[in-house]
Amino acid sequence: MQHTQSEKLHEEALQHIVGGVNSPSRSYKAVGGGSPVAMERGSGAYFWDVDGNKYIDYLAAYGPIITGHAHPHITKAIQTAAENGVLYGTPTKHEVTFAKMLKEAIPALDKVRFVNSGTEAVMTTIRVARAYTGRTKIIKFAGCYHGHSDLVLVAAGSGPSTLGTPDSAGVPKSIANEVITVPFNDIDSYKEALDKWGNDIAAVLVEPIVGNFGIVEPKSGFLEQVNELTHNAGALVIYDEVITAFRFMYGGAQDLLGVKPDLTALGKIIGGGLPIGAYGGRKEIMEQVAPLGPAYQAGTMAGNPASILSGIACLEVLKEKGTYEKLDRLGAMLEEGILAHAETHGIDITVNRLKGALTVYFTNEKVENYEQAENTDGDMFAAFFKLMLERGINLAPSKYEAWFITTAHTEEDIKDTLKAVDDSFKQLKQRM
């Protein structure tokens, strides 16, 4: 494939946009560098770049595009919003409709509030939890990304009983001192953290199914134990379902797993491709939020008609019969094919899959926590990523990210993808 126009565009972008990209995950730094491919058009499961090359897309904008690009029902909803005004600054009937849809889908939401992103949603759940409990510290799990607000850009300390350290320049040490980071799926470390800091903990922030160092499921009983221990300490459980909500079933991962949090943060899929976030939870906790309570949160763009109508349309599509069965079927087909080709060519991989999302790790070890994900072979992934890109398969440019199947993908797309996997593994083996 030729990428001449992408390369020229990236050179121009570097003159005007920091790093040439508007989110660092879009750069190719994690896969050895180079000019990221610039896309011009998306339709269904496919992308076309500025050089005219066609790709089968498994990035899905890092998850939100679960119905494929430019789904006609969602497109029509956005067009309707554009024709009637995209921003009012007033209440609308559509935001009530959408709030009811979310509550019906996720029973833990007694009350909801719309915001503009997953970052905002998580940031506000932490504020609300602090207001409700009168405490300040939070616990999070290593490797789990919860947006780019200061409080969650914190790396682990030297152990579960030590405070975190800033994971980004510009995050004050004083803020990192409010965060304890422990390994995911390690209940003993979680107990140790609570033994040390329990009386100061406002909430634990949990991805019930991890999506940010690949797809990693909780061990049996882990979430239940986290709930029990947290509540015994007088703290709240916050689920970050920005990636997981409506990804694995119609509703949240909490409903799939049968574990209920106190507060939930939502984003990505619920906007149908437009910017949105939402948070919600138990009535008595949510009543801490202004104008009812002292925890302030506001937003000019929050609940705007364009995002709300797009979100309603997206959920209407996802509610159709057979949606999640199809995603699971195609996911299984893709997983089985990848593993078979890896065995044929003698490539060490493991695949973590849940229904229509999976991660391919270049390792022979089952990945259950961030340390294991970190130890997978990044050089092998980088080579694989570039080989797949040349064969018309668009993946996220990071070994930590998931492949997302959409409702627009077909069995033929999976077969074509597996041909590319077979050829790429063959090339990798020859280089070893």
From Swiss-Prot:
It catalyses: (S)-4-amino-5-oxopentanoate = 5-aminolevulinate. Pathway: Porphyrin-containing compound metabolism; protoporphyrin-IX biosynthesis; 5-aminolevulinate from L-glutamyl-tRNA(Glu): step 2/2. InterPro entries: 4pyrrol_synth_GluAld_NH2Trfase (IPR004639), Aminotrans_3 (IPR005814), Aminotrans_3_PPA_site (IPR049704), PyrdxlP-dep_Trfase (IPR015424), PyrdxlP-dep_Trfase_major (IPR015421), PyrdxlP-dep_Trfase_small (IPR015422). The modification N6-(pyridoxal phosphate)lysine is found at K268. Its cofactor is pyridoxal 5'-phosphate. Coiled coil: none annotated. Its EC number is 5.4.3.8. One of its GO terms (molecular function) is transaminase activity. PROSITE patterns: AA_TRANSFER_CLASS_3. One of its GO terms (cellular component) is cytoplasm. The keyword Cytoplasm applies. GO terms for biological process: protoporphyrinogen IX biosynthetic process. It is found in: Cytoplasm. Keywords: Cytoplasm, Isomerase, Porphyrin biosynthesis, Pyridoxal phosphate. The keyword Secreted does not apply. Its main location: cytoplasm. Belongs to the class-III pyridoxal-phosphate-dependent aminotransferase family. HemL subfamily. PANTHER family: GLUTAMATE-1-SEMIALDEHYDE 2,1-AMINOMUTASE, GLUTAMATE-1-SEMIALDEHYDE 2,1-AMINOMUTASE 2. Homodimer. This is Glutamate-1-semialdehyde 2,1-aminomutase 1.
